[in-house]
Amino acid sequence: MSQLFPGRYTVNVSEPFVIFLIGMRVNQFWAMKKWWSVSSAMGPMLKVLKENPEKGMLGAESFFRVWPLETCMVTYWRSFDDLIRFARSSDDPHLKPWQDFMKNIGGDGSVGIWHETYRVNPGDYESIYGNMPAFGLGKAFEPVPISEKTRKATERMGAIAQK
C-alpha cells in the first residue's frame, strides 16, 4: 500500500504545466482484436515515459469502467511541447500505434478514442487531498501541508500567482 499523508495537503506549482486526458471506449465488444490492440499499446508508452523522465511526463492516474468498457488516464506534463514531441516521434512508442489505429480501425466505430489537453498556469488550479497517498497533482508535484493561508479553495486558487 502507498504511503498515506495524514491530514490535508495541497500542491504549489510555480511553473506552467499541462494536463492531458486520454481514453478509449469499446463500442463493439465482439471486435476484441481491434480494441485489444488499442488498449495494449498504452503499456509500452507508459514504460518509456516512466523510465525516461526527461521526456516530460510528470505523473499519471488511470481509471476504468466495466460497462460500457472505457478507460481514462489523467497525465501531467512539464509542457505541451514535450507532449507533442513524444506523440510525433518515430523513436517513441506512440506514433506507430496511432498510425495502426488510423489504418485498421479509423472510422469503423468499433473502438472510440479521445483526448483532451489543458495548459495550466500557476495559480489557475487548486487541489486538496485528505488522508491520501500521493495522487494526481499531489503525485506529479511535491505535496505540501495545508496552512492557514491555503485552508480554503478560494485561498488556494491563485495563491501562487499572488506571490
Language model segments and positions:
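Tryptophan-centric aromatic hotspots in well-structured domains and transmembrane helices
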Residues: 76-78
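Short S/T/G/P-rich N-terminal loop/turn motif that feeds into the first structured element of a domain
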Residues: 1-65, 70, 82-85, 109-163
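An amphipathic, aromatic/His-enriched active-site/gating alpha helix that lines ligand/cofactor pockets
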Residues: 80-113
